[in-house]
Amino acid sequence: MTLRNKAFHQLRQLFQQHTARWQHELPDLTKPQYAVMRAIADKPGIEQVALIEAAVSTKATLAEMLARMENRGLVRREHDAADKRRRFVWLTAEGEKILAAAIPIGDSVDEEFLGRLSAEEQELFVQLVRKMMNT
């Protein structure tokens, strides 16, 4: 196996391990849903399209995810009165409750993996990933 193939193979394994751990600890909340809920909590009433980056998804996929979350009572969406194409999103009381319970668990899962690295290694890891993503 070439170094290039090995690196990406190991990254896939790492993400699969992290996802499996996440699903075990938070079976009712996907990582993208969690990220979107964190973004909404940081900016209540955020415009729906601004959540695309947090969800790491397309506009259509995000809209579907938010519709499912709305049906579960986690978020509330409202159209802009002046422009019906624009929607704004808030967490519901239930969404706030679920997020508050999920944050320490999500942080713990992330720390389980990142904690294997020193603080310097964590910073280098982030820098290298950003460099590879060209951001």
Curated annotation (Swiss-Prot):
Superkingdom of this protein's organism: Bacteria
UniProt DNA-binding region: 48-71
One GO molecular-function entry: DNA binding
Keyword terms, alphabetized: DNA-binding, Transcription, Transcription regulation, Virulence
Pfam families in alphabetical order: MarR
InterPro entries, sorted: HTH_MarR-typ, Tscrpt_reg_MarR-type_CS, WH-like_DNA-bd_sf, WH_DNA-bd_sf
Domain HTH marR-type: residue ranges: 4-134
Transmembrane segments: none
Functional description taken from the UniProt entry: Involved in the temperature-dependent positive control of flagellum-driven swimming motility and cellular aggregation. Regulates fliC expression by directly interacting with fliC promoter.
Protein name, per record: Transcriptional regulator HosA
Lineage: Bacteria, Pseudomonadati, Pseudomonadota, Gammaproteobacteria, Enterobacterales
Gene name, Swiss-Prot/TrEMBL: hosA
